[in-house]
Amino acid sequence: MLEYSVKARRIDDHGSLATTKQAEVMLDTDMSGRDDAFNPAELFLASIAACMIKGIERVTPMLDFNLRGVEVKLHGIRQDSPPKMVSINYEIIVDTDEDDRRLDLLHKNVRKFGTISNTVADAVQLEGMIMRTRDPATSK
């Protein structure tokens, strides 16, 4: 079993700082919002994206899957009362020449073995798709 620890502290009424290991992330905890930091909802979505990308990094060697890059786009919908995320849609965009069957296999592995995405999927509607950035027939 793995364990994780993060500490966050208020800097001032405009922001907070989260730390773990030797890393820091500025948090938007300003009631008016701020453009130079992730607010809690954006940080939540970024955590899902990081989980998916890390999952891809984990399974590509096992699948002998070749790629040049990955981008994950997420869109969350929040209800007001009580405030919570009710659905999250994602697109995983892979720069690869692998065929559709292999791309689907990558997607299945990412969804099956993602700690954060599995946790979220138990609580919120999490749906999405995987696609490639290049058409294999024209990218050679």
Spans of features found by a protein language model:
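Alpha-helical metal-binding/catalytic segments enriched in His/Glu/Asp
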Residues: 51-52
